[in-house]
């Protein structure tokens, strides 16, 4: 193996019928962690129900169904490798909570694969005003996914017949659109593919001799490796807190930024509890340090399960510790809300692992979604499609951060009527004074060391 491969998280976006499952399934199928036995089983099942043509998509559908039933599948099934990198598909739309997952998702995507259906009529539908292609590209960019590879899929369709003209037309139109969204078009690679036939997926297609660029796998290999935020102060949102006999209280969560070591004195916000980290475990092994991306359990001294809970954030007491937010200002994009939203609206916000109602205390201005320019000061209300700067007040104690400082704690989904009605990124936070919280004996002792 030699040098460790670069790990990249990918999100797959695009219109509902663009062929995302087939293209993604094909990559996983050809370069992935699915063993031949499983594939043969899927193929037989697909044939039995007369859907043999869906074998690649079927792979993904099976995985999705298992995921939705809450069966955590071996994540290897969602991985595929290239000579340089290991890619994990962290989400593919079509999944009910796709938008919410993209925001509160267990991991930030390092790049997006935008899949476009090249067939006559299909491309037009996807890129039209109501098409999801635009929405997904804008969301990905707003949430900090700055690298993208665009696949012009279905080049084998009879209306396209592997033709260069259609490809050029699509490249021109999509480039103009994603440039408006904010992407640097010079850095975005376009690849004409057939997710079903396999053209230009892994091997160069003989049916498109006019295309001189990379295959999809090569284009993915050319993406810039992500910078993991280990040099930032520690932020670890809690997913759960367990009480384990003979050990004590064990919070569990994923390190988003920074590093945590045994012996560190940490503060939990908004609980405002400070204590010492006794030990850290991952996959039942003791760790000398936990770094970004690690899902860990750690033992804390003199803290009861009642003191801290899911949604709390753990940070280092001596290095910009987390604090409760009194209020915060965010740029909010309304996606689908049936009515007008005015001051006083109080939906639930999903931000990192917290799930708390927040009041739209003051809609300060309506802005242009792309440029951020102010369009209207203090509008009476905002509706679907609008973007606004809003001052928000949590209705219960909550810990959030500015997106530019701690991205995973600075983006949120607004949930109402069982769907994601808006997304936002946090621009500023007014923090409460953290003094006067509970400091355990262990913390005092450790601080003197």
UniProtKB/Swiss-Prot annotation:
Summarizing the function annotation, the protein's role is:
This protein promotes the GTP-dependent binding of aminoacyl-tRNA to the A-site of ribosomes during protein biosynthesis.
Annotated GO MF terms: calmodulin binding; GTP binding; GTPase activity; mRNA binding; translation elongation factor activity
Q: How is it modified after translation?
A: Phosphatidylethanolamine (PE) is a direct precursor of the ethanolamine-phosphoglycerol (EPG) moiety.
Q: What's the protein here called?
A: Elongation factor 1-alpha 1
What family is this protein classified in? Belongs to the TRAFAC class translation factor GTPase superfamily. Classic translation factor GTPase family. EF-Tu/EF-1A subfamily.
Q: Which segments carry the region annotation G4?
A: 153-156
One family from Pfam that matches here is: GTP_EFTU_D2
Q: Where does GTP bind?
A: 14-21, 91-95, 153-156
Query: At what positions is 5-glutamyl glycerylphosphorylethanolamine found?
Result: 362
Task: Keywords in alphabetical order, please.
Answer: Cytoplasm, Elongation factor, GTP-binding, Nucleotide-binding, Phosphoprotein, Protein biosynthesis
Principal cellular location given in the protein's record: cytoplasm
Any extra detail in the entry? Answer: The Kennedy pathway is the major route for phosphatidylethanolamine (PE) synthesis, as shown by reduced levels after using RNAi against the first two enzymes of the Kennedy pathway.
Q: SUPFAM superfamilies of this UniProt entry? A: EF-Tu/eEF-1alpha/eIF2-gamma C-terminal domain (SSF50465), P-loop containing nucleoside triphosphate hydrolases (SSF52540), Translation proteins (SSF50447)
The compartments listed are: Cytoplasm
The annotated region (G5) lies at 194-196
**What is the gene called?**
TEF1
A GO cellular component annotated for this chain's UniProt record is: cytoplasm
**Upper classification of the organism:** Eukaryota, Discoba, Euglenozoa, Kinetoplastea, Metakinetoplastina
* Record region (G3): 91-94
Q: Region G1: what ranges?
A: 14-21
Q: Which GO terms describe its biological process?
A: calcium-mediated signaling; microtubule-based process; translation; translational elongation
Q: Where is the signal peptide?
A: none
The segment(s) forming the tr-type G domain are 5-230
Q: Where is this region: G2?
A: 70-74
Biological source species: Trypanosoma brucei brucei (strain 927/4 GUTat10.1)
């Amino acid at each position: 193996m030699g040098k460790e491969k670069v790990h990249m998280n990918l999100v797959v976006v695009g219109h509902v019928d663009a062929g995302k499952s087939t293209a993604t399934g094909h990559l996983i199928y050809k370069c992935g962690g699915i063993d031949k036995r499983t594939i043969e089983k899927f193929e037989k099942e697909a044939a039995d129900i007369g859907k043999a043509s869906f074998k690649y998509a079927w792979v993904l559908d099976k995985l999705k169904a298992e995921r939705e039933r809450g069966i955590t599948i071996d994540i290897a099934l969602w991985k595929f490798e290239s000579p340089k990198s290991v890619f994990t598909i962290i989400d593919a739309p079509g999944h009910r909570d796709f938008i919410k997952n993209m925001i509160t998702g267990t991991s930030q995507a390092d790049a997006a694969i935008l899949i476009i259906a090249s067939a006559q009529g299909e491309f037009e539908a996807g890129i039209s005003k109501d098409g999801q292609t635009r929405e997904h590209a804008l969301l990905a960019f707003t949430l900090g996914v700055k690298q993208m590879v665009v696949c012009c899929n279905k080049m084998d369709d009879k209306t396209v017949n592997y033709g260069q003209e259609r490809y050029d037309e699509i490249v021109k139109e999509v480039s103009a659109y994603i440039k408006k969204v904010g992407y640097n078009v010079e850095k975005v690679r376009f690849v004409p593919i057939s997710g079903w036939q396999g053209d230009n997926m892994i091997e160069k297609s003989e049916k498109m001799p006019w295309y001189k660029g990379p295959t999809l796998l090569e284009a993915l290999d050319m993406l810039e490796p992500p910078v993991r935020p280990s040099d930032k102060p520690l932020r670890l949102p809690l997913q759960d807190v367990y009480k384990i006999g003979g050990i004590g209280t064990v919070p569990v969560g994923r390190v988003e930024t920074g590093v945590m070591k045994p012996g560190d004195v940490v503060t939990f916000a908004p609980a405002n509890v400070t204590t010492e980290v006794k030990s850290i475990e991952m996959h039942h092994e003791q760790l000398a340090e936990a770094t970004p991306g690690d899902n860990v359990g750690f033992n804390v001294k003199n803290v009861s399960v009642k003191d801290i809970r899911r949604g709390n954030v753990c940070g280092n007491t001596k290095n910009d510790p987390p604090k409760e937010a009194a209020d915060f200002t965010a740029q909010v994009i309304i996606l689908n809300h049936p009515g007008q939203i005015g001051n006083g609206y109080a939906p639930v916000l999903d931000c990192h692992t917290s799930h708390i109602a927040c009041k739209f205390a003051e809609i300060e201005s309506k802005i242009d979604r792309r440029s951020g320019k102010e369009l209207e000061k203090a509008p009476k209300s905002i509706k679907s499609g609008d973007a606004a700067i809003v001052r928000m007040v949590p209705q219960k104690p909550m810990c959030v951060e500015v997106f530019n400082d701690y991205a995973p704690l600075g983006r949120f989904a607004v949930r109402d009527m069982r769907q994601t009605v808006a997304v936002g990124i946090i621009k500023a936070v007014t923090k409460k004074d953290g003094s006067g919280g509970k400091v355990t004996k262990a913390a005092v002792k450790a601080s003197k060391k």
